[in-house]
Design a protein with these regions (language model features):
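Glycine/serine-rich phosphate-binding loop and adjoining beta1-alpha1 elements at the start
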Residues: 2-41, 72-80, 85-207
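Adenosine-phosphate binding glycine-rich loop
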Residues: 12-25, 41-45, 53, 168-206, ...
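Glycine-rich phosphate/diphosphate-binding loop of Rossmann-like nucleotide-binding domains
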Residues: 50-68, 183, 187-261, 267-272
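A short helix->loop->beta-strand "cap" motif at the edges of active sites that frequently abuts
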Residues: 67-69, 93, 138-141, 229-230, ...
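A short, aliphatic-rich alpha-helical micro-motif
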Residues: 114-115, 204, 256-262, 280-284
Length: 414
């Protein structure tokens, strides 16, 4: 099957990017060394729908090295890097992805990938799973199962599962300790500010940053904003998380009040309509809006477009400026899509090494338990988290103590 990419001539740059991340992903290298010769996925068709950049490309190559017939699609229209897609295609992996594709093209790419009749899938955000449950149900009998990378995707899976409609086993990799404690917090924290700062070239120190949502991703964004010298305000709907934010030293208030103070706004909720027409008129002139949630629904862009009294314009690459009726200008980054990928290179390599090692093990676990799992949402066994964490510590030249027999007996005494 022929790939659908921007331009195969872009491959050399993509190969360079993949070679760089390979040097900094020791866990995937270990898994590659351990299982490539055994071809543990031999002959299995696998669809990987994920933000298509160098780190994810190396995951796809590792799965291919271990015997899988891998097809890759992007999970967000603005996160695909065309040179990396070309490099993957050049290395023999079928790719259906282009940067800034239309919604129609995006859906076509997902459908083309599913035409390969996969046995295993890796999803990021839930679009692939949604298509399987809606327009491509004929493929479900062939599925062993799949895994989900993100909080947003897990929310969608939980809704399916609670309604009794989940049609095949899925593993919530996002809910693994080695994923959310590091990827969601440290990954999102660093990469979101990398995207914001490289796009705006503005100082963060001394500014007021409003972080919408105080889950693990929001904690990371707020932590890094504080470290950069910002005054941080958190908005929440959960009183427990609100208390957490206060105890972490942040002001907590409703978005309607916070809208008056923010210089930067970062949404990290996984929900829609977090910032809307109710809030835009209250904002400072020059306010910067960024979304770090999976879908472009957290900042209501349609409201912005309806309210602007002058045609919106790109004032700088990846910054669209809207003029409010009161004359104030509001700057939207990356069309309201994932700022760390639409405006940057995504999470740090070393962090994604943990997440993608978990994805690899999720595929292995599903295969090893073929026919044993119900149509349900699962988390990876704790021993796999522990194994990956131990390997990562070793790769980082760090070590921990072990319990003596006496200590073990003390802790496990009845």
């Amino acid at each position: 099957m022929n790939s659908m990419i921007k331009d195969i001539a872009l491959a050399p740059t993509g190969h360079q990017k993949i070679a760089w991340v390979k040097e900094h992903m020791p866990l995937l290298n270990i898994l590659n060394e351990r299982y490539a010769e055994k071809k543990i996925f031999d002959g299995l068709n696998m669809v990987v729908t994920i933000h298509l950049e160098a780190k994810t490309a190396y995951l796809a190559q590792t799965l291919k090295n271990c015997g899988a017939n891998v097809v890759v699609t992007g999970s967000n229209p603005l996160s695909t890097q065309d040179d990396v897609a070309a490099a993957l295609a050049d290395s023999g992996i079928t790719v259906f992805a282009t940067h800034a594709c239309s919604q129609e093209e995006y859906d076509l790419y997902l459908s083309k990938a599913l035409d390969t009749k996969p046995s295993l899938i890796i999803d990021d955000g839930g679009d692939l799973v949604n298509m399987l449950h809606s327009t491509r149900r004929e493929l479900i009998p062939n599925l062993i199962g799949g895994s989900e990378e993100t909080t947003t995707g897990v929310h969608r899976l939980k809704a399916l599962n609670e309604a009794g409609k989940l049609a095949f086993p899925m593993i919530a990799v996002n809910d693994a300790y080695c994923k959310y404690l590091f990827d969601n917090r440290y990954g999102t924290g660093q990469s979101s500010w990398d995207g914001i700062m490289r796009t705006t070239n503005l100082a963060v120190a001394g500014k007021t940053v409003v972080v919408a949502g105080y889950g693990w991703c929001g904690k990371g964004v707020a932590m890094r904003a504080k470290g950069l010298g910002a005054n941080v305000i958190v908005t929440e709907i959960d009183p427990i998380k609100g208390i957490e934010a206060v105890f972490d030293g942040f002001r907590v208030m409703p978005m309607r009040e916070a809208a008056k103070y923010g210089d930067f706004f970062v949404t990290v909720t996984g929900c829609k309509d977090v910032i809307t027409k109710e809030h835009f008129p209250l904002m400072k002139d020059g306010a910067v809006l960024a979304n770090a949630g999976h879908f472009d629904v957290e900042i209501n862009v349609k409201d912005l477009e309806a309210m602007t009294v002058e045609p919106a314009y790109e004032v700088r690459k990846n910054i669209t400026t809207y003029t409010m009726p009161n004359g104030k200008k509001i700057n939207l980054l990356g069309e309201g899509r994932l700022v760390n990928l639409a405006c940057g290179d995504g999470h740090p390599v070393e962090v994604m090494d943990l997440s993608f090692a978990m994805q690899f093990l999720a595929m292995k676990y599903l295969l090893e338990h073929k026919g044993e799992l119900q149509n349900n949402l699962y988390v990876l066994p704790e021993e796999l988290n522990t194994e990956i964490a131990a390997l990562k510590l070793e790769a980082m030249c760090a070590g921990i103590d072990t319990l003596t027999p006496e200590q073990y007996a003390y802790l496990h005494a009845e």
